[in-house]
Amino acid sequence: LPNVLNDVNALSTKYGSILDYYESLNLIKRKPVSKRIVINDIKITLVPANEEGTVTIFVFEQNGKKLIYAPCDVKPFPNSRLFNDADYLIIGNTIIGNNLKNNFYLTKNNPLNLELFSFEEVLEIKAKYNIQNVVFTHLEEDWGKSYDDYLNLEKECIAVKFAYDGMTIEL
């Protein structure tokens, strides 16, 4: 997406563009992608998550399997038939529960609810698109939950996992 590439190309040091430097050393090759790219036999489709085209959801497809990666800032979740029947949705920027750190209770009218998905909203996305499994990532310690708290929640829900460093997913 052009806006995303412009933002990435703007990354620089006092010496200039970081990516220009890496490309001059033949370490990288930039290739603008507007809708999709195929690498070997993996098709990667880019779905804009906002009108400005600055936030992207990535849909990976290979051998009849499908994984959606929706990292950050994807609320509201865009409508796309491409999401139907995915094997996995990996999603970030969520709030799990209303009882947060230091006895803070997140009310329905809190502005965070406009930016971040609740656990229940993610389950609604899962149901709407018939997604088989969900992995929550970018878990925030600020919410006051330990990883054990997330593991206990996993036991209560079918096909829901919470990411951890080094996690791998087999499709």
What are these regions (language model features)?
Residues L1-Y69, V74-R81, Y147-L171:
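Binuclear metal-dependent hydrolase catalytic cores
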Residues P76-M167:
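Cap/insert and terminal regions of metallo-dependent hydrolase folds
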